[in-house]
Amino acid sequence: MAQKIIGRKQEIKELLDLYKENKPVFAVIYGRRRVGKTFLVRELFQDKMSFYHTGLSPYELSGQKIMEQQLTSFYSSLVRYGSKGKKVPSSWLEAFDALINLLEEQDADKRQVIFIDELPWLDTPRSGFVTALEHFWNGWAAGKQNIMLVVCGSATSWISDKLLNNKGGLFDRTTDEIKLRPFTLGECEEYYQANNIVMSKFDQIQCYMATGGIPYYISMLQKGKSLAQNMDRLFFEPAAKLGLEFDRLYSSLFTNAEDCMTIVRLLAQKRQGYTRKEIVSLTKIPDGGGLSATLKSLEVSDFITSYVKYDYPKREVYFRLTDFYSKFYLSFIDGRKTTNPHFWQDNLLTPELTAWRGFTFESLCYYHLPQIKQALGISGVQTEVSPWKSRKEKDGAQIDMIIDRADRIINVCEMKFCEDDFSINAAYDKNLRHKLSTFAEETKCRSSLHLTLVTTYGLKFNEYAGRVQSVVTMDDLFK
């Protein structure tokens, strides 16, 4: 079944190797919601599973007896796989004992794959779920050579705290962990080809700017429609699926969803993000352990990224929004009163959309840093990457991306999203020279500065083109 899976070659190899091992396996797969965790495991092991269960979303169960509902659902899965239990377990200890009984009735010489999806959702308040899971693994499964327990979760911070960094009975018990990330541009292209969706690379990049390479989102695209038609259908028509996704997404992942959404909305306002101190001041969320946990949860779930600006003496940490879907939603849907179901088609050439493409292309380039390094021939060179802005000029020089290399070269990267080859004119050449000289003067760097252009189609040759040392095109980003 693995041939149906787009990309994920390393993850497929890892899971199949674990399946072939003659020892107990406790594998944890985590990553952002909608990224394809469930699909990956089901396609690989659908005819090999001895038990499969998925937790119920607390978002959908709000106000109900959540633990009771989760146990009832778990019992239904047990019965589906042959359990002879006559009643719904009253606790998670009983539920896992019933699972042990079910597995012991099956062939002990055969590899038994147990797949529990959305595991964090089962851990409702005061449920004792983690203790019961410890009992199941330490007291039974860890002693069975044929057991392969695979658990998935979108609540990445829960996975990190309760499994990967557990200080109790599950300390150091997981045998393998896989973080599943969104598709790259190249993997998206592979998906489109496999599903007969015809789209130019130029449009694929714009699609990525809105969907972030999330497999579930791009699976909604309809072949035979233009990108603009699909954008309107998914985001702007009445009851558009992705127009309604934002609240559902955060509420299903985070127990403190309101604080998370407040921080994300703030970070969406400024491309380079804010410091922790600024976040406290602007959101009025109290500084302390709660804020630390919230920022950590957002970061491990790949919604935000922390970084330190190049050559800033305080080494102050900044947080910026890096989830493409969230940025798109907050830019064009959140709080808007427009009811135009053809908003995207009607505004393709407006300054607002042109500016959005330019800013978001920078984020896309950061996500595809490995492809940029490969194009520059420095994949094996240690690098530090960040934006830079002059500290001496109020509205002065700033550089989209600095790649500071261990071989004493600094790639000063300019990102340009264009519909044709990019042309450097006299004014832009002057601007570039100012950026390079200001950067060299303020940072006192001793490395050689290589001006690098990352753009869609390439650089038009003229009298100013020689200043550019290297060009990375969108074709390189798809590799």
Q: How does the language model describe each region?
A:
Residues M1-P351, L451:
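Phosphate-binding site recognition
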Residues Y310-Y312, V317-K479:
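A cross-kingdom feature that marks ATP-driven nucleic-acid transaction machinery
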